[in-house]
Amino acid sequence: MNAQEANFDGLVGPTHNYAGLSFGNVASLNNEKSAANPKAAAKQGLRKMKQLADLGFAQGVLPPQERPSLRLLRELGFSGKDADVIAKAAKQAPELLAAASSASAMWTANAATVSPSADTSDGRVHFTPANLCSKLHRAIEHEATRRTLSTLFADPAHFAVHEALTGTPALGDEGAANHTRFCAEYGKPGIEFFVYGRAEYRRGPEPKRFPARQTFEASRAVAHRHGLAEEATVYAQQDPDVIDAGVFHNDVISVGNRDTLFTHERAFVNKQAIYDTLTAALDARGARLNVIEVPEAAVSVNDAVTSYLFNSQLLSRADGSQVLVVPQECRENGNVAAYLDELAAGNGPIHDVLVFDLRESMKNGGGPACLRLRVVLNEAERAAVTSNVWINDTLFTSLDTWIDRHYRDRLAPEDLADPALLEESRTALDELTQILRVGSLYDFQR
C-alpha cells in the first residue's frame, strides 16, 4: 500500500522561555536567563509547517503540553491554591518553577520513537513515548505525550501506543532524535537505525564532559516492543567526543531519509563497520545506501553544533529528489553556507536547500529536526487520524490568529512567577483543543 512520511511538528507553548535547563545543550546554556518571545517562537514554527505543507509534504501539528505543571510543583511539596503554589516555588526554588514551566515538549523529535506498519510484526504503527529521564523538565512529558498520541492515533486496528520505558538511567530514552529509518519506499519494509550514547551493561567509550542520554538498552527495548525484525535493526554508538562537543542527540550530527544518510565524519564509533552493516541490511530490502559524509575539514563539529546543519529535515519529493530543510544559522556560518552551496550544485540526491527562521527555538538548542516527529502512514492509517491536525490554509489561519490572541511577545525568567501566566496558558489551550478537535486533553479540563 502507498505510504507517505508525515511530519508532526510541536506547536510552541505560551511559556516558551530560556532557563538554561539542559546541561550538554550548548545553545540552551549560552542563552540562559535571556528574555524569550513566545509569540514569535510559535509563529516561526507554524510558518515552517505551512510552507512545507504548501510544497506537498504531509504536515501535522501536535499541541503544547500544559505549563506550568502544577502537578510537578505539588509533587515537589508546594501546596495551596494554584497561585500560592507558583508563588511559593518562585520564592523558594525558582529553578523548579522554571523546570515546571518549560515548553520543551515543542521538540517532538523527543516525544517518541515511531515504527511504521511495514516494519512491525503485527502490521500496526507503533509509538513508544520517550521517558526523557535525564532531565527533570522533560521527564514530566511522557504521560501527556502518550495521551496526545493515543488521541490522535486512536484506532487499535492501526496503531499501538505504548507506555514509556521505566525512567531509570539504564533505560534512558530520548526518542526519535536518536532513531531514523532507511527504505526503498516508505510503504515497503525498511531498516530501523538506533543510535545510543552509552551502554549500561557493556563496557565501551563514554563521554567525559556531558552525559550520554540514550542507552543501548533503551534502544533495544523499543525495537523489541515494536516487533522489529532483528536483521532489519541496526544499532550504532555515537562518538563520545562529539557528545562532549555539544552533540547531545544524534540528530545534531546526522540525519537520514529513505536511502540517504547525511552525516558528519565524526558522528559514530567504528563508522565504517556501521556503514557496511547498514548497506548490507538495506541491500536485502531492495535499496542501496547513499552516505553523504561531511568532512571535518569542510565543516567542523563546532560548526555543526553552532549552525545545526545536521539538525535538518531531509525530505523526499514525489519525483524522488530530496530537499534539506535548515535553520538560517546555516547561512550565517561561512563554512556551512559554502558546503551547502556545493551540496545543492552537485550530482547527489539532495537538490535543494530550504532555509527557515527558527531563531527562538534555536536559542534553546532546537532546529528543524527537533521540532518534528516523523510518522510514516499508509492511506488507511492516515484516514484513521480524525483530529483536525493536518496543516492547510484554514488550520494555519486559525492557529495564527489563536497565537495572536493568547501569546505574550516577551517572557523573562522572572515572569514565570506571574500567576496570570497559568490562566493565560489554560485559556489558550482550552481553545486550542476545540480548534484541533482533540477533546479534553489536559488535566485542567477533566
UniProtKB/Swiss-Prot annotation:
Reported EC number(s) for this entry are 3.5.3.23
- Keyword Metal-binding belongs to the record: no
Taxonomy, superkingdom = Bacteria
Work out whether the entry's keyword set contains DNA-binding.
Answer: no
Any single GO molecular-function term of the entry would be:
N-succinylarginine dihydrolase activity
Assigned keywords, A-Z = Arginine metabolism, Hydrolase
Which residues participate directly in catalysis?
A: E174, H249, C370
Span of the signal peptide: none
**What Gene Ontology biological process does one annotation of this record name?**
arginine catabolic process to glutamate
Specify which residues bind substrate according to the UniProt entry for this protein. 19-28, 110, 137-138, 213, 251, 364
**Pathway the protein acts in:** Amino-acid degradation; L-arginine degradation via AST pathway; L-glutamate and succinate from L-arginine: step 2/5
Enumerate the InterPro entries for this protein: AstB_sf, SuccinylArg_d-Hdrlase_AstB
Q: Which reaction does it catalyse?
A: N(2)-succinyl-L-arginine + 2 H2O + 2 H(+) = N(2)-succinyl-L-ornithine + 2 NH4(+) + CO2
Family of this protein: Belongs to the succinylarginine dihydrolase family.
Its job? Catalyzes the hydrolysis of N(2)-succinylarginine into N(2)-succinylornithine, ammonia and CO(2).
Q: Which NCBIfam families match?
A: arg_catab_astB, PRK13281.1
The UniProt subunit note reads as follows: Homodimer.
Matching HAMAP family, A to Z? AstB
Q: What is this protein called?
A: N-succinylarginine dihydrolase
Q: Which organism is it from?
A: Burkholderia lata (strain ATCC 17760 / DSM 23089 / LMG 22485 / NCIMB 9086 / R18194 / 383)
| Name of the encoding gene | astB
